[in-house]
Amino acid sequence: MDRRRFIKGSMAMAAVCGTSGIASLFSQAAFAADSDIADGQTQRFDFSILQSMAHDLAQTAWRGAPRPLPDTLATMTPQAYNSIQYDAEKSLWHNVENRQLDAQFFHMGMGFRRRVRMFSVDPATHLAREIHFRPELFKYNDAGVDTKQLEGQSDLGFAGFRVFKAPELARRDVVSFLGASYFRAVDDTYQYGLSARGLAIDTYTDSKEEFPDFTAFWFDTVKPGATTFTVYALLDSASITGAYKFTIHCEKNQVIMDVENHLYARKDIKQLGIAPMTSMFSCGTNERRMCDTIHPQIHDSDRLSMWRGNGEWICRPLNNPQKLQFNAYTDNNPKGFGLLQLDRDFSHYQDIMGWYNKRPSLWVEPRNKWGKGTIGLMEIPTTGETLDNIVCFWQPEKAVKAGDEFAFQYRLYWSAQPPVHCPLARVMATRTGMGGFPEGWAPGEHYPEKWARRFAVDFVGGDLKAAAPKGIEPVITLSSGEAKQIEILYIEPIDGYRIQFDWYPTSDSTDPVDMRMYLRCQGDAISETWLYQYFPPAPDKRQYVDDRVMS
């Protein structure tokens, strides 16, 4: 949890086994034209070489924790770290004619202690040269860094990188890789939100969670006028190594990443998380427990959406539970899943600092057969917006043993809306509140005699209008308790239907209640499936208290 909190805070305000090559005057001159900042010797590089490097690295012992930073960097505050700026005149692709993309590097410091090596690659000759750290690549401003401590530290490395797109080539980045294997991207709002990771290990097991690191990146020199770039990454951790290829399309309204990885297990792994993503949900329309601020909602994402291998669409609203929860949803060759932020209305957040209405959704689209497994969702209690408390990933069914090799291909969409939608009626919003009284009498002069919890789920789209005259039937399944006072209400402002029901307990149990609902018309499903997890209060809390003072 400490690592997750640190990454969140830092983002708001990272030893490679080399492959030797023979340098030539021709290759040195070629690189000078493309990347003045690359100063290392040339070496052969392509994705197959990186795969061999990752494979061989897995046969050796993990090198352990990173070495200590110079004192001037290790003791930095977040404010000081954020004041360090990369010199835009020394950017990676600064000399590329008609460049539409450019890359800059993050400085080491604060909690970013793992050295990340950077290489520039000529894609025509498959020759790479390292870019070594040197203080003149940065502007230290008022960070208070003693640059004398950095002299001669060419092997210090960098913490990560970020990419800019024209016309904001040096001002507003669209892609960022920083910290462990975390990375993010934006849509056309330029507002960062949730994060992805290269890999998740033992997120919810009896072992300590492991955070693999990207320890080196190789950048193909971008073509003139191109808005797509390719970067390769070496992943390393105590349990596994990996070779990654990211082909990143920086489009007008979204960023799309084609990801290919080859993984090599060093040791047995209890829980391997593929295409993991990390987000934040503090409070929303369905969960008001932590909403005692001026903001009606606070979240990076409001739901987990799943398109199952059998074609079923599922909407699972997120929670901020009082106790950590982990749910696993079984599937076979999933078609896609993601953490979505679909409510883009500023008035629903009233936040001019976080701008949650501008934050992107993230959708994962598998590109090869993933087989059997589960989509894991972990929800961690949080008291505010500074902790990423939502984790989601694909876990293969097959147990991971030392020496196993895996290959996954998938596409990531960072956009306001996912690239695909359920063709049936979709869940627009979920609301919860006091139950046990007729709608329109909330709750009347006297509180209800019997305690209940009300749920209201709004559906829009699909064939709802055509189905209405024939009869819409909510199909509700509960793991415990009873659903009563079920109503179907037409909501004109959204041109959709609200399914409303009251949940009544049938025992004193406080175990989570799993709820499932979909809409049916004449025997056929006409909506995606709504899943929800409700946490009943203790029996002595199941009462209404009238705290009015009348005299």
From Swiss-Prot:
GO terms for molecular function: carbohydrate binding; catalytic activity. PANTHER family: GLUCANS BIOSYNTHESIS PROTEIN (PTHR30504), GLUCANS BIOSYNTHESIS PROTEIN D (PTHR30504:SF3). It is found in: Periplasm. Belongs to the OpgD/OpgG family. Probably involved in the control of the structural glucose backbone of osmoregulated periplasmic glucans (OPGs). The keyword NADP does not apply. It holds the Pfam family MdoG. This is Glucans biosynthesis protein D. Its main location: periplasm. Gene3D superfamilies: 2.70.98.10, Immunoglobulins (2.60.40.10). One of its GO terms (cellular component) is outer membrane-bounded periplasmic space. Coiled coil: none annotated. Pathway: Glycan metabolism; osmoregulated periplasmic glucan (OPG) biosynthesis. Residues 1-32 form the signal peptide. It comes from the Bacteria. InterPro entries: Gal_mutarotase_sf_dom (IPR011013), GH-type_carb-bd (IPR014718), Glucan_biosyn_MdoD (IPR023724), Glucan_biosyn_MdoG/MdoD (IPR014438), Glucan_biosyn_MdoG_C (IPR007444), Ig-like_fold (IPR013783), Ig_E-set (IPR014756), TAT_signal (IPR006311). One of its GO terms (biological process) is beta-glucan biosynthetic process. The keyword Signal applies. Keywords: Periplasm, Signal. Predicted to be exported by the Tat system. The position of the signal peptide cleavage has not been experimentally proven.
